[in-house]
Amino acid sequence: MLARIDSPEDIKNLSQKQIDELSQEIRKTIIDVVGKNGGHLASNLGVVELTIALHRVFNSPQDAIIWDVSHQCYAHKLLTGRYKNFSSLRQKDGISGFTNPNEDSADYFISGHASTSISSALGLLVARKLQNDEGKVIAVLKFFDGRKPA
C-alpha cells in the first residue's frame, strides 16, 4: 500500500482497516530502514497514527506541518512521496533524517533543535496572513522525548 502513496491526498479516503494496515506498513518500513542506516526509531514509531491523522485532516503541503526538532518526521516523509527513496535515509546524497525543504515542498524548514517549531510556525502564519494566504500552520511538539525537563 505504501508504494502507491505519492502524496497525502492518497490517504484521505482510506477505510479504518486500510489505515491500520498502512500504520503497520509504515512502522515496518521505519524499523527496517533505521535498522540498516541508523536513525531515530522510537520517536518515529510513536507518531505514526498522529502523522496519518494530520495528513488526512489538513492539506499538506498547502497547510504547513512544522515538526519540532523534526527527528520524528519519517512517517511524514513516507506519506509525502518519498517511499521509493526512503532506503537512502541518512546516507550520502540520500533522504535527510530531518525535514528539509530541498527534498520536498511539504518540509518547510531544516530543523534539528528543540522548541523552534512554535516560533517558526508563528512566523510562517504571520507571513501567510500578510499575503492573504489561507493555508493553515500546524506545529507538532513532542515533549519529554527521553529527556528530563529542566
Stretches found by the model and what they are:
Residues 40-150:
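Cofactor-binding active-site loop characterized by glycine-rich and histidine/acidic residues
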Residues 32-41:
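Asp/Glu-centered strand-loop micro-motifs enriched in Gly/Pro and often flanked by an aromatic residue
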Residues 1-33:
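Cofactor-/ligand-binding subdomain signature composed of acidic, glycine-rich
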Residues 12, 36, 105-106:
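A short, mixed-charge helix-start or loop-turn motif at secondary-structure junctions
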